[in-house]
């Protein structure tokens, strides 16, 4: 599994 990392496992808004 992978933790929520912006651009890796999920998308994050700036």
From Swiss-Prot:
| Location (main, coarse) | secreted
- Sites where N4-methylasparagine occurs are at 3
**Taxonomic lineage of the native organism:** Bacteria, Bacillati, Actinomycetota, Actinomycetes, Pseudonocardiales
- Family membership, please give it: Belongs to the thiocillin family.
What is the name attached to this protein's record? Amythiamicin A/B
Give the organism the record lists. Answer: Amycolatopsis sp. (strain MI481-42F4 / FERM P-12739)
Modification type Cysteine methyl ester: residues:
12
Give the position of the cross-link 5-methylthiazole-4-carboxylic acid (Asn-Cys): 3-4
Q: Where in the cell is it found?
A: Secreted
A Gene Ontology biological process in which this protein takes part is: defense response to bacterium
What residues does the Pyridine-2,5-dicarboxylic acid (Ser-Ser) (with C-10) crosslink join? 1-11
- Renumbered to this chain, where is the cross-link Pyridine-2,5-dicarboxylic acid (Ser-Cys) (with S-11)? 1-10
Q: Residues involved in crosslink (Oxazoline-4-carboxylic acid (Cys-Ser))?
A: 12-13
């Amino acid at each position: 599994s992978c933790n929520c990392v912006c651009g890796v496992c999920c998308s994050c808004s700036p």
